[in-house]
Amino acid sequence: MPLLLSGRVFRRDLDACGCLAMHVPLEGGSETRLLRRLRAAGYRTQLSSARGLGDPEVFLFQLHGIRPPHLGHQSVGRNGAVGEVQQVMPQLAELFVDNVPVVLWLLEGQVLSRSELLALCDLCKRESRLRVVVEMGGARSLNWQPMSTLLGV
């Protein structure tokens, strides 16, 4: 990997494909460099982990309920057998206020199933301002490819 990475080719590929699969060096640093270049180019960015994502469209765009972790002995008479449900704001709702492209950078993307990755690709096709970068594991050098190529679609 060159010392100075301008990010121009990465931005062009991201705009063309919408959803990219990345393999990054395990020592890190290259993804934050690309995020900084994207922010400087006018993109809004959101860095998140893919673990516990669930349904991508609901998690990212709609008000949804979650159940907090069980912290020991608590009264079940208060909330019933299913437990307490808390409403959570969507992750990307406040980033779509202007006509600025938004990049969602998902760490640990290797835990996502094929159907979840396809749902992310479809989400990028439906929402023209959304770009998704999924880190699919480690590599000796920084490389990326369209998610549709990785999935064989």
Swiss-Prot record:
**Membrane topology recorded in Swiss-Prot or TrEMBL:** Peripheral membrane protein
Q: What class of enzyme is it?
A: translocase
Organism domain of life = Bacteria
One GO CC term, this protein: plasma membrane-derived thylakoid membrane
EC numbers for this chain: 7.1.1.-
Which GO molecular-function terms appear in the entry?
oxidoreductase activity, acting on NAD(P)H, quinone or similar compound as acceptor; quinone binding
- Note whether Transport occurs among the keywords: yes
Q: Where is this gene product found?
A: Cellular thylakoid membrane
Keywords in alphabetical order:
Membrane, NAD, NADP, Plastoquinone, Quinone, Thylakoid, Translocase, Transport
> Is the NAD keyword given for this protein?
yes
One Pfam match, by short name? Answer: NdhN
Q: How does it assemble?
A: NDH-1 can be composed of about 15 different subunits; different subcomplexes with different compositions have been identified which probably have different functions.
Q: Which family does it belong to?
A: Belongs to the complex I NdhN subunit family.
| Function summary | NDH-1 shuttles electrons from an unknown electron donor, via FMN and iron-sulfur (Fe-S) centers, to quinones in the respiratory and/or the photosynthetic chain. The immediate electron acceptor for the enzyme in this species is believed to be plastoquinone. Couples the redox reaction to proton translocation, and thus conserves the redox energy in a proton gradient. Cyanobacterial NDH-1 also plays a role in inorganic carbon-concentration.
- Identify the PANTHER family for this entry: NAD(P)H-QUINONE OXIDOREDUCTASE SUBUNIT N, CHLOROPLASTIC
Name of the protein in its database record: NAD(P)H-quinone oxidoreductase subunit N
Q: What is the lineage of its organism?
A: Bacteria, Bacillati, Cyanobacteriota, Cyanophyceae, Synechococcales
Gene this protein is translated from: ndhN
